[in-house]
Regions:
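Cysteine-centric segments in proteins
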Residues: 1-59, 66-116
Length: 116
């Protein structure tokens, strides 16, 4: 039976946001995570740590080798917010930084260059 990764190699996230957290402890570099709603699966998602981000396409590769694509505008989905709170609790995360505006700005900049 094919794995979930083979069946759904790219997870498209709507109503997305991006956060940094000290996942590996206070002294380690903070990791970036996408939070959003995967409409195709009908599920809220928190990505594993993002390793590479392509702002031109709004696509990122995660530590789990899954590909995430940020679709449409940034925002907050109620189920995603609950999933994010639960994820932080499970990973004992007390601090986080919302870096959504920076990601949105970079993506918007690339989109406007494509239109021009």
């Amino acid at each position: 039976m094919p794995s979930t990764y083979e069946l759904e190699p790219i997870v498209e996230l709507t109503s997305w946001s991006v956060y940094e957290v000290p996942l590996h402890g206070a002294g380690a570099p903070w990791t970036k995570h996408f939070v959003g709603y995967a409409e195709a699966q009908g599920l809220a998602q928190v990505s594993p740590a993002i390793l590479m981000f392509d702002p031109e396409h709004g696509v990122a590769a995660s530590a789990s080798h899954r590909i995430f694509q940020l679709v449409g505008e940034c925002g907050r989905h109620p189920e995603s917010e609950l999933m994010w709170a639960r994820w932080k609790e499970l990973n004992d995360i007390q601090l986080h930084r919302d870096i959504t505006p920076a990601f949105f700005e970079v993506i918007s900049s690339h989109r406007s260059r494509q239109v021009a």
